[in-house]
Each structure stands twice: as C-alpha cells, then as structure tokens.
C-alpha cells in the first residue's frame, strides 16, 4: 500500500492473475491493510454506485464523529477519485490527492475517518464499490462543493461536469464550513496515524 499526499489516504495495487479463463485478484487483504494502517477495517456497510459519464459527487463526513472510513474500488469503467483533507487541525488540511480507479488495475483506495471524498465518472456505467466502517447517516452529511476554486481540484477540462447535490443546504462552498462544529477535527480520529507530507493539490 502506498501513502498518498493526504494524511490517512492509501492506495493499494493488487496482483492480478490472468489466463485464458479471465483474471483473478484480491482487491482487499485484511492482513496487508492492518500492517500498513495499524488497525483492522471495521465493516458496517458496503455500497455500490453506478454513474453516467461526467457526473461528480462529493461529501465530507457523512456520519457523526469520528466519521466514516472508506475502502473504494472501481469495478467497471473508470472514475477520477479524489481525497480532500477537511479535518480541522490536520497537517495536510486543505490538500487533495486524485487517482484514476478503473476496472483494469482494480486498485483500492483507503480514506481514513473524516477525509472528504469525491469522484467523477470518466466513462458511462462507471461502477464504484466501497466498504464503510460506519453506517451512513443522512442528516449528519456535510458536503463541500467539489468544483469550488478555493479547493482547486484539477478536474478534467474536456468533460462538461455535472455536479451532484449542487445547491442543497449541505453543499457548501469551501471557505464557509471551516468554523468549529461543521468540519471534523483531526485529533482523536482513528485513521490519523500516519502524518504524511505532500503538496497541496496532487493530481493523478
């Protein structure tokens, strides 16, 4: 597993065995995960999202503290998956990292509790599957506008992006929700174990 430029975000690249019958891989290994992260992934919910090309969704901490850790993979098509550090007090607060997840490499992306998550479908029928450490709580969701220039995510310029949730009460500009009580705090988050460095705005 490779530590990305956002603290608490890791990328796993599985070994894929291919022959005339097809292919086989392990897109998640509990032992490898625990050795790198320092604790097991608690599984409370598994989600599957199928999106048309150009649709983009983002959320920050969709459960009460400490938040919801996620382990994400793309089962079909291709997505640009983005991690944003929205945890107050984090050494990488405000930074983002983006990776292309697709059905060819079958990589897995881990996001620690409290990290913001956004993805954009680069193909039709892009299928994202993710394991969650806590159940989703709709009334606790806090979404940040993924297209806000204050964050500066470098989305593809050759696709007309269709943001999901734009204009809803929880879909805030980036600067507004920095006050206490809206964004999650870094201290006490179980996933805040590896304090990586990095640059603001790391692209794929």
UniProtKB/Swiss-Prot annotation:
GO biological process, one term: dTDP-rhamnose biosynthetic process
Pathway recorded for this protein: Antibiotic biosynthesis
Keyword Isomerase: yes
Site residues, Participates in a stacking interaction with the thymidine ring of dTDP-4-oxo-6-deoxyglucose: 136
Annotated EC: 5.1.3.-
UniProt binding sites for substrate: 21, 26, 45-47, 70, 117, 141
Function: Involved in the biosynthesis of one of the two 2,6-deoxysugars, dTDP-L-oleandrose, attached to the macrolactone ring oleandolide to produce the aglycone antibiotic oleandomycin. Probably catalyzes the conversion of dTDP-4-keto-2,6-dideoxy-alpha-D-glucose to dTDP-4-keto-2,6-dideoxy-beta-L-galactose.
Protein name listed in UniProt: Probable dTDP-4-oxo-2,6-dideoxy-D-glucose 3,5-epimerase
Species of the source: Streptomyces antibioticus
Classification lineage: Bacteria, Bacillati, Actinomycetota, Actinomycetes, Kitasatosporales
Underlying gene: oleL
């Amino acid at each position: 597993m490779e530590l990305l430029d956002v603290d608490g975000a890791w990328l796993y690249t599985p070994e894929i065995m291919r022959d005339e019958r097809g292919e086989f891989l392990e897109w998640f290994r509990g032992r490898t995960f625990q050795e790198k992260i320092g604790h097991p992934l608690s599984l409370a919910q598994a989600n599957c999202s199928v999106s048309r090309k150009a649709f983009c969704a983002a959320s920050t901490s969709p459960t009460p503290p400490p938040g919801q850790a996620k382990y994400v993979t793309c089962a079909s098509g291709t997505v640009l998956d983005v991690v944003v550090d929205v945890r107050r007090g984090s050494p990488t607060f405000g930074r983002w990292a983006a990776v292309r997840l697709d059905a060819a490499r079958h990589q897995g992306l881990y996001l620690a509790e409290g990290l913001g998550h956004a993805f954009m479908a680069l193909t039709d029928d892009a299928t994202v599957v993710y394991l969650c450490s806590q159940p989703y709580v709709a009334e606790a969701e806090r979404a940040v506008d993924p297209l806000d220039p204050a964050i500066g995510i470098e989305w593809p310029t050759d696709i007309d992006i269709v943001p999901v949730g734009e204009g809803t009460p929880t879909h805030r500009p980036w600067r507004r929700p920095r006050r206490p009580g809206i964004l999650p705090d870094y201290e006490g988050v179980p996933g805040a174990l590896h304090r990586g460095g990095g640059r603001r705005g790391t692209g794929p």
